[in-house]
Amino acid sequence: MCRTRELNGLRALMARINNWNLATQNNKVYVADNERHYLVSDLGAAFGKTEWPPSDVPRLPHATEGVLKDYEHSSLIRAVKGDSVTFEMHTTAPFFVRIFRGKYFNKYKQAQRVAQGIPVVDAQRIGALLARLTPQQIRDAFRAAGYQPAEVDGLAKVVEKRIAALIHLKE
């Protein structure tokens, strides 16, 4: 796989919003006129946490989606080593859940790799691009996605903090 700075930025973005549903059918790279276009078609499994135990979405054995309190308290960065960063991303349930849901486990076990070994410079670059968004634009995106008014400001604040964290990696 050719990992361009744009693809690495997309990987950092998916980690930043805790999008654990990184199945191939949800994320594509298209080439048109010798130019790559990156498409994410499903962000429903984002803005929660990607770790055990799930809080209030019992249908998911390992994560939550769209839960402000979980997103606020979730970790972003696992480690920065040398010139690369690994983001916190747990896409599989604990062993005692996996043994009963083998297909589910197999579907998501490789997705954790998306958040590993991203060049710091590429993560900082996507952070700088995202920093161009105004606070109003970020809040408008959450409103357009159907979040409740009480959640919009909280989610936006977490996003803004995570953008700043991307920009200031290794500082």
Where are these regions (language model features)?
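Catalytic glutamate of the conserved HExxH
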Residues: 15, 22, 43
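Hydrophobic residue at the +6 position relative to the catalytic HRD Asp in the kinase catalytic loop
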Residues: 22-29
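C-terminal catalytic region of ATP-dependent kinase domains
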Residues: 35-171
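Generic structural signal marking isolated hydrophobic packing positions
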Residues: 21-22, 159
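ATP-dependent phospho-/nucleotidyl transfer catalytic cores
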Residues: 1-19, 32-33, 136
